[in-house]
Amino acid sequence: MITRIDVTNRFSEVAIYNGIAYFAGQVPTDESKDAYQQTQQVLSEIDKYLAKSNTDKSRILMATVYLANMADYTEMNRAWDEWVAPNNAPPRAAIEARLANPNWKVEIVITAAINHQ
């Protein structure tokens, strides 16, 4: 069975299947912020959906970070390093890409193992 969280007509924020939660790309809530602050916002959204998925950041299996400009890599990493679970940093890729909204500096996609109830 597939469980979907926060479903819209276009996409779900999370789909859970066979013990794995697949997340949609999470984006900043305030486009006026700098890369560090936008990354903090995105990570906060990820925390929210991890909780809704009955899991946490220590169970992230993979993260893909999309940056509008690689010049923001250091500031994104600063926010990431403050947030990531100690001794549980997941595999991660960082890619420069043109994002759907030109004011977004970062978008992050993850997969995570869920906690079985």
UniProtKB/Swiss-Prot annotation:
Gene3D superfamilies: RutC-like (3.30.1330.40). Coiled coil: none annotated. InterPro entries: RidA_CS, RutC-like_sf, YjgF/YER057c/UK114, YoaB-like. Belongs to the RutC family. PANTHER family: PTHR47328, RUTC FAMILY PROTEIN YOAB. This is RutC family protein HD_0322.
